């Protein structure tokens, strides 16, 4: 008999499941992104309570879900506005990345590449190290 995915005593996934790794990666890339630019890249808002990690290509595109080139610090309102009017964010990303890198990112986002468990596990280790480095840099 297989063990249940979740136990009744808590609602947390078991350690090192693909879901648990993705949840930790979300937190890691969000922290890294907000440490690198502690203000909204579109409007300049710097109240840390309002800042979020905004995905240019949405999270449902696995190849760029945790790609730091796809993530920028946005305030809550700009992140919501991006869903309805993507043009200002698109223009910013084109300026920031350049056309060549932007097109490569777009290609990766639309590719059907599956990100497997091993890739996620290795990416998590990279992001842990990168976060520690960013925290040392900021401190």
PLM feature spans:
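Short Cys/His-centered divalent metal-binding micro-motifs
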Residues: 45-49, 71-98
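Histidine-centered nuclease catalytic patch
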Residues: 41-72, 82
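A boundary/linker detector
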Residues: 1-32, 44-47, 105-139
